[in-house]
Amino acid sequence: MEVILLERISKLGQMGETVKVRDGFARNYLLPLGKALRANAANKARFESERATLEARNLERKSEAQKVADVLDGKSFIVVRSAGETGQLYGSVAARDVVEVLAAEGFNIGRNQVHLNTPIKAIGLHKVELQLHAEVEINIELNVARSAEEAERQAKGEELTSVDAIYGVDEDALRPEDFFDPEADGLDENEA
């Protein structure tokens, strides 16, 4: 099916272009969301008459997205989750969780604007891409940790997945030489 794009769609085309797409993509996504019109003579004339208002509306949306992007770009957010000693989460951090964290900070971002290839399943610092507008993409950093204190340590660059990092190094721990002394058992060094 041929459609006229009413806004820029990534990997498809710019506003005003007539592109050929699969019927299901047009019927289920582009047409219901108002991102495109069927390509026929009446709709082409309608698009040309409304082009100025569509471009103004698109420019307004882009400027709003750019304002949010200027505030969010490169910012770090802390996500506290339960995890095992190896740093493996007992669940995962998905796009829904990213939206909740951003909403708690006062940013209204939709789930479809968060681009995670796979859910986050380990503690650490993770980059997350947000597409606020077809022409505005930014990256934020998620600091996934077991607690706020661990998040601070992680932000400083400490490794938190080893047992020593979690529990600390015990200086008073017993060593094997404390239990076994070859001289005390009456063995010569040659026999041992």
Swiss-Prot record:
InterPro entries: Ribosomal_bL9 (IPR000244), Ribosomal_bL9/RNase_H1_N (IPR009027), Ribosomal_bL9_bac/chp (IPR020594), Ribosomal_bL9_C (IPR020069), Ribosomal_bL9_C_sf (IPR036791), Ribosomal_bL9_N (IPR020070), Ribosomal_bL9_N_sf (IPR036935). GO terms for cellular component: ribonucleoprotein complex; ribosome. Keywords: Ribonucleoprotein, Ribosomal protein, RNA-binding, rRNA-binding. Pfam families: Ribosomal_L9_C (PF03948), Ribosomal_L9_N (PF01281). Residues 173-192 are annotated as: Disordered. The keyword Ribonucleoprotein applies. The keyword Ribosomal protein applies. One of its GO terms (biological process) is translation. Residues 179-192 have a biased composition (Acidic residues). SUPFAM superfamilies: L9 N-domain-like, Ribosomal protein L9 C-domain. GO terms for molecular function: rRNA binding; structural constituent of ribosome. Belongs to the bacterial ribosomal protein bL9 family. NCBIfam families: L9. Binds to the 23S rRNA. This is Large ribosomal subunit protein bL9. The lineage of its organism: Bacteria, Pseudomonadati, Pseudomonadota, Alphaproteobacteria, Hyphomicrobiales.
